[in-house]
Amino acid sequence: MGDTIFNPDFIDGSEGMHSEAPSPRTKKHRRAGYRTGDLVLNKQDILDNVEFLTVPGQLPIPIVKRVEPFELPLQALPFSKVINKDNKDLMVVFYEPDTNFARVLHNPKRYVKPLKKFSCVVGPDFSQKIGMNEFMRYSNNWWNKALTAFYQSQGVFMIPNVTWSDPASYAYAFMGLPKHSVIAINCTGIKGNHAAMYLWRKGYEEALRVLDPILIIRYGDKMSGEREDISIYFENINLKNLRNGR
């Protein structure tokens, strides 16, 4: 998440204090500040209709609603590749670099109508990589749930996206997520990395133990030891294109 979300200059009180005409650079800086301010305002009330789980010693956790089994579309594609397309019979996923969908975090309301047109949408997947600052991992996990809950409250058909990092993250990673629900789990980018595969498998096992899902939408390569009897697999289109030289 390399994009700036808040710029202190937006409320630094300096507007109107200079007698000289502002330079083009100053005007540009102010415009950027106002845009940043708009982004903050666009998020300040999005959680008004979201329920929260109160957890001692933690911030309230957004509650994501349970999803019953339904007829799945045949194809799952990344947000950045389909958001401006008209094909509605798709499942939208956020399994791509954070920068490709950071705009959803910056201005969630803007994407309510575009996301509603699709058959279903798997919840956002902001990174929680090993080596990231612990607060950033927690924050990204929190916003993954918060945005999913927000879009559910707006009538978008959202699938809970289950994410984690290392075993320490289990203390919060699965909180607020529904039990006995359809869920989605991604494994993109870990095959061939034994440490990453080990951590993924441990988290997968814990997710199934805690959430006891009735159906798992799986994106990416099939991993050994999975519950294939309750899983439906979707191909990683980016990886497919890479393998085909496109």
Predicted regions and their residues:
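Eukaryote-skewed repeat-based solenoidal scaffolds used as protein-protein interaction platforms
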Residues: 80-87, 91-94, 102-244
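SEC14/CRAL-TRIO lipid-binding/transfer domains and related phosphoinositide-recognition modules
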Residues: 2-129, 146
